[in-house]
């Protein structure tokens, strides 16, 4: 690894540690020329599928966009940030497991709705009302009936 201070190519690894999550390796290094120390991090690089929007355009998958939409749906609801992050991790796991290069925005939306339904029924209804573009009260009532039916079964 090239030293960021003097540019010398030879460095020595002094210490290596794994992050608690197990997805990052931290290495403490020392330059053999100038003797200065620096830290490097190694992370797994994941390639999410491109998201194909309804108009046919393609955009990169954006975790923050998913997180923001979930946080908006769950605003003032008793759902922790950790629970949202775990839900997003499950969504991303499903996106990666398909191994496809592209995925429709509708499929991403359905994955978000499934996770919101697990987390909080009110958040699910809020998201569904915007995502499915309800035109009238009957469509809203259908989703309410669906949620009520799942609560009765439990």
Swiss-Prot record:
A GO BP annotation: negative regulation of DNA-templated transcription
Keyword DNA-binding: yes
Lineage: superkingdom: Bacteria
Domain ATP-cone: 49-139
Keywords, in A-Z order: ATP-binding, DNA-binding, Metal-binding, Nucleotide-binding, Repressor, Transcription, Transcription regulation, Zinc, Zinc-finger
Entries under HAMAP family matching the protein: NrdR
The protein's name: Transcriptional repressor NrdR
Protein function: Negatively regulates transcription of bacterial ribonucleotide reductase nrd genes and operons by binding to NrdR-boxes.
Protein family (similarity comment): Belongs to the NrdR family.
Cofactor(s) needed for function: Zn(2+)
Zinc finger (unnamed) in chain: 3-34
Family annotation (InterPro entries): ATP-cone_dom, NrdR-like_N, RNR_NrdR-like
GO molecular function, one term: ATP binding
Cross-referenced PROSITE patterns: ATP_CONE (PS51161)
Cofactor note: Binds 1 zinc ion.
Origin species: Ralstonia pickettii (strain 12J)
């Amino acid at each position: 690894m090239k030293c960021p201070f003097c540019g010398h190519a030879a460095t020595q690894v002094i210490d290596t540690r794994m992050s608690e999550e197990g997805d990052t390796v931290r290495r403490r290094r020392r330059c053999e020329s100038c003797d200065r120390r620096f830290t490097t991090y190694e992370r797994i690089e994941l390639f999410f599928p491109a998201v194909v929007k309804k108009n046919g355009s393609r955009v990169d998958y954006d975790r923050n966009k998913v997180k923001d939409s979930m946080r908006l749906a769950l605003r003032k609801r008793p759902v922790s940030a950790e629970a949202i992050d775990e839900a997003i991790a499950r969504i991303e796991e499903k996106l990666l497991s398909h191994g496809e290069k592209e995925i429709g925005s509708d499929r991403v939306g359905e994955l978000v709705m499934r996770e919101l339904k697990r987390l909080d029924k009110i958040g699910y209804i809020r998201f569904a009302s915007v995502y499915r573009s309800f035109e009238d009260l009957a469509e809203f009532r259908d989703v309410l009936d669906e949620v009520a039916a799942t609560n009765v079964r439990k």
